Design a protein with these regions (language model features):
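Nucleotide/phosphate-binding catalytic cleft detector across ATP-hydrolyzing
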Residues: 1-153, 161-283, 290-374
């Protein structure tokens, strides 16, 4: 018998939750392709090793950008490989799959995700909004008629939402998150230190010494890259410099400020009763970005948000796993409570349900978005 799965199809990583097992796969969203033949050579962590290696015969692709598919063929190959690897298909059955997406996803982007998941082996494929699923994975009761606020900072998008009664009350989706912060670091070091580094090194810097605030005791780190200064008439020679957490905060400041500003706007849009709930319960912070600054005393992104929003901020227990876990949990819940499944998958009122039924059913009668058939 097939096992249902929940997929966090992230810009940086793919996580898959398997029914009865929990998180069974966590791999980089990377595909390595032979330039001459267009053949897929490696996927996931095996492909990630080729980033910045300078091999002209191999093209390294990150098939998702800003939380949505940018290379359909590579995404399809990647998902198919991962699903087959988990052996979730039955002898004569295929799994139900829930995939998560940003709240500002377009109709074309929705269809691409659904089709990729179907090609990977899904029978009924569902799409749900990421902050809603992240909230479930973080342990929040989204069906309670109490206000909850979630900030989910992933690789490609930052999704901010207020939820109550099983629905999203208001939300923002910024195509500005972990990957943008990594690019900010690369750009800053190029301009301020005259050194060129690649994505893997920038990721290490972000994780090890990154800070969301200027701190009294920054952590230092010595890094190596290519010299971009031409004082000796020779560019590209190896170069070593020492940086610290306050340098990295300066590099990331503008992007972090945009996320904070959007969170303030969300809080300004909600009713006083919901605002009171959020003050009492705090904001739940999820996604890989929730760990930013966690190694620097006083530099965590939770501290930044709490300082700027004047609301308690809590980091979920397993922020990297919340979306995949929440997707799997919703599918399992839907199977147990099928009479209430429309609410589970986000159809909160008749007009919204009608709109989804009209706009999002595609190609095959058994492929739907935000819809479980009774």
């Amino acid at each position: 018998m097939a096992k249902d799965i929940g997929i966090d199809l992230g810009t940086a990583n793919v996580l898959i939750y398997v029914e009865g097992q929990g998180i069974a796969l966590n791999e980089p969203s990377v595909v390595a392709i032979d330039v001459k033949t267009d053949k897929v050579l490696a996927i996931g962590s095996d492909a990630y090793k080729w980033i910045d290696r300078g091999n002209q015969d191999i093209r390294v692709v990150r098939p998702l950008k800003d939380g949505v598919i940018s290379d359909f063929d590579a995404t399809e190959a990647m998902l198919t490989t991962f699903v087959n690897q988990l052996r979730v298909k039955g002898w004569m059955s295929r799994p139900n799959i829930m995939v998560c997406a940003p709240t500002n996803i377009t109709e074309i982007e929705r269809k691409a995700i659904i089709q990729a998941a179907q090609s990977a082996g899904g029978t009924n494929v569902y799409l749900e909004y990421e902050p809603k699923v992240a909230a479930v994975g973080a342990g929040l009761d989204i069906f309670d008629f109490v206000g909850s606020m979630v900030i989910d900072i992933g690789g490609g998008t930052s999704d901010i939402a207020v939820l109550s009664g099983g629905d999203i009350v208001t939300s923002r989706s910024l195509r500005m998150a972990g990957d943008q912060l990594t690019q900010d670091i690369i750009r800053y070091l190029r301009l301020q230190f005259g050194i060129l580094i690649g994505m893997p090194m920038a990721e290490r810097i972000k994780q090890d010494v990154g800070s969301s605030l200027q701190v009294t005791n920054p952590i230092e780190m010595t890094i190596r890259g290519q010299d971009l200064n031409d004082a000796n008439s020779v560019k590209g020679l190896p170069k070593q410099v020492t940086i610290d957490s306050n340098d990295i905060e300066e590099a990331m400041h503008a992007t972090l400020n945009t996320i904070v500003r959007s969170a303030k706007e969300i809080l300004g849009e909600i009713q006083p009763g919901l605002a009171g709930d959020i003050i009492d319960r705090g904001i739940m912070l999820t996604g890989g970005g929730a760990l930013l600054g966690s190694k620097v005393k006083g530099g965590g992104i939770d501290s930044l948000l709490q300082q700027e929003l004047h609301v308690p901020v809590n980091i979920s227990e397993s922020p990297l796993d919340n979306v995949a876990k929440g997707a799997g949990t919703l599918l399992e819940y839907a199977k147990r409570e099928r009479h209430n499944s429309h609410q589970i998958l986000g159809i909160g009122n008749p007009s919204y349900k009608k709109k989804l039924d009209q706009e999002t059913q595609i190609e095959s009668n058994n492929i739907h978005i935000n819809k479980v058939e009774n």
